[in-house]
Amino acid sequence: ILYIADAGRFVFMGRMLDVWQQKELKTIDEIERATQRVFLDTMGYDKTTYAGYKLGHGPRRTVLFVDPHCGWCHKLISEVKSDPELLKDYTFIFHVVPVLGEASHTYAKKLWCSVGTDEEKLQAMLEGDEAMNALPAMTSCPMDDQDHTVMLSKIIGVRGVPFVIAPDGRVSQGKPADIKAFLRGEEPKQAKAAAKPQK
């Protein structure tokens, strides 16, 4: 790899390694592809070590990071839940992370520490704070998986939600205008996202 600074004075030469993919990047195309994708499998991603909620039973996995109070996240979850074709073709793993403030942190923990199926918890999130508060709480709730989820979101650069990782590693930072088209790899339209409020 050869990198020349704008003014042409400095030249960097050497190897570039992608730790996530565990491989050397040798071409511009490989570098471009690596910077636009998140390869969860080579990062050692295992759904069972993170706080996640599953919808669907298809062979292709899609991972999404959402916030309890994110309107675009709610719209995306509703679209997925109501589409039998999506649920047949994909398995969706929703990771709830507190991107939008302290209240989101409280409700992300409340969802994780509640009793119910994944679908029931996601439905409560869609219905709002009252429904989430009504979920029965576990008697004991280790937070390791939720903490790992927040750490993973920071490692891969989740700054706004929803953050969608397609089965082939492509990323949508925001709600895809057409989730089916995005998952098929078609050219995306403008995505919609909720970002953390500026302090």
Residue ranges and their predicted role:
Residues 1-13, 128-199:
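C-terminal cap of thioredoxin/glutaredoxin-like
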Residues 19-20, 27-30, 37-39, 87-91, ...:
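Glycine-rich loops and low-complexity Gly/Arg-rich segments
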Residues 22-27, 52-56, 122-127:
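A broad, low-specificity signal for short, low-complexity segments enriched in glycine/proline
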Residues 59-142, 154-159, 184, 193-197:
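Structural alpha/beta surface segment adjacent to cysteine/selenocysteine redox centers
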